[in-house]
């Protein structure tokens, strides 16, 4: 079996073949995910909340992401691994490159950055230096203090138009992938149709090219803070983790998940 690459994701978009992705933080789970058919994994700064117990992603450091990227890579050597760049590690292009290089050396295939068109020069700089970039728009958790909490984004016409413009700017700058979080389904479809690069949704309906879930949400172990867009696949699978992961991948690929009750308008 050959490694999964961004070329595979582009081909899947052209073929309208939906794909599932999930967060991973260690070798055991990344191996299990790959064995159950998930070929794309994100070492997310969500680990600040799910693994470290913080109330936001802001305390996560590059060293944290490096460590978990190394673990995930060992467990799934053929997966396409995305690694988050933590809060305040990409304020300037120069700072971004040194931080991104650490993640790539740790085993990442691509780095993910949160932000709109202001990031375009940074995305261009990284791409020119052979660092693939995944953008992240909509509800960007590192901006929680600006948003005043975890809220749906892009509901007004002006906000929706700005988000679409940001997505196009990131693609033009060289981004090869985009995560779209907590936006209305209609806006998610506009963005997905407008971009030639694959779009991965989370809380964006079933109209995007792929889906991602935080693994703890997919297993129903997030506690009282389970988001509306999440589904407990572990409960639906009788407590069998492997079956739960397989069901998640299957429902995404068949367009069953996310359903209407997991979507925003």
From Swiss-Prot:
Pathway noted in the entry: Cofactor biosynthesis; (R)-pantothenate biosynthesis; (R)-pantoate from 3-methyl-2-oxobutanoate: step 1/2
Q: Which HAMAP family match?
A: PanB (MF_00156)
Q: What is this protein called?
A: 3-methyl-2-oxobutanoate hydroxymethyltransferase
Residue ranges annotated as coiled coil are none
Q: Does the keyword RNA-binding apply?
A: no
Q: Which chemical reaction does it catalyze?
A: 3-methyl-2-oxobutanoate + (6R)-5,10-methylene-5,6,7,8-tetrahydrofolate + H2O = 2-dehydropantoate + (6S)-5,6,7,8-tetrahydrofolate
Q: Which cofactor does it need?
A: Mg(2+)
Which family is this sequence assigned to? Belongs to the PanB family.
Q: Which InterPro entries match?
A: Pantoate_hydroxy_MeTrfase (IPR003700), Pyrv/PenolPyrv_kinase-like_dom (IPR015813), Pyrv_kinase-like_dom_sf (IPR040442)
Q: Where does 3-methyl-2-oxobutanoate bind?
A: 45-46, 84, 112
Q: Which GO terms describe its cellular component?
A: cytoplasm
The residues responsible for catalysis, as annotated, are: 181
Note the NCBIfam families from the entry: panB, PRK00311.1
Keyword terms = Cytoplasm, Magnesium, Metal-binding, Pantothenate biosynthesis, Transferase
Keyword hit for Phosphoprotein: no
Query: Which GO molecular function entries does the Swiss-Prot or TrEMBL record give?
Result: 3-methyl-2-oxobutanoate hydroxymethyltransferase activity; magnesium ion binding
What organism is the protein native to?
Pectobacterium carotovorum subsp. carotovorum (strain PC1)
Q: Which domain of life is it from?
A: Bacteria
Alphabetical list of SUPFAM superfamilies matching this protein:
Phosphoenolpyruvate/pyruvate domain (SSF51621)
Where does the record say this protein resides?
Cytoplasm
Subunit structure, interactors included:
Homodecamer; pentamer of dimers.
**Residues binding Mg(2+):** 45, 84, 114
Q: How is the cofactor bound?
A: Binds 1 Mg(2+) ion per subunit.
Name of the gene encoding the protein in the UniProt record:
panB
Q: What class of enzyme is it?
A: transferase
Q: Name one Pfam family in it.
A: Pantoate_transf
Gene3D superfamilies, alphabetized: Phosphoenolpyruvate-binding domains
């Amino acid at each position: 079996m050959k490694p999964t690459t961004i070329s595979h994701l582009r081909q899947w978009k052209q073929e309208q073949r939906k794909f599932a992705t999930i967060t991973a933080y260690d070798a055991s789970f990344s191996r299990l995910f790959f064995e159950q058919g998930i070929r794309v994994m994100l070492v997310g700064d969500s680990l600040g909340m799910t693994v470290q117990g913080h109330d936001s992603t802001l305390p996560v450091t590059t060293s944290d992401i490096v460590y978990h990227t190394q673990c995930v890579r060992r467990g799934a050597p053929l997966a396409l691994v995305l690694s988050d760049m933590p809060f305040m590690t990409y304020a300037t292009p120069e700072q971004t490159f040194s931080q991104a290089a650490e993640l790539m050396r740790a085993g990442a295939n691509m780095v993910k950055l949160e932000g709109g068109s202001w990031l375009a020069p940074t995305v261009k700089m990284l791409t020119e230096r052979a660092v693939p970039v995944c953008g992240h728009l909509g509800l960007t958790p590192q901006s929680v203090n600006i948003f005043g909490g975890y809220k749906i984004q892009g509901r007004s016409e002006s906000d929706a138009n700005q988000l679409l413009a940001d997505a196009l700017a990131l693609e033009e700058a060289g981004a090869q992938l985009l995560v779209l979080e907590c936006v209305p389904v209609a806006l998610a479809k506009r963005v997905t149709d407008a971009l030639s690069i694959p779009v991965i949704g989370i809380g964006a309906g079933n109209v995007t090219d792929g889906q991602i879930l935080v693994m703890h949400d997919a297993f129903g172990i997030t506690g009282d803070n389970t988001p509306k867009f999440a589904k407990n696949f572990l409960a639906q699978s009788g407590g069998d983790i492997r079956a739960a992961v397989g069901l998640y991948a299957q429902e995404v690929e068949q367009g069953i998940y996310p359903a209407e009750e997991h979507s925003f308008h």
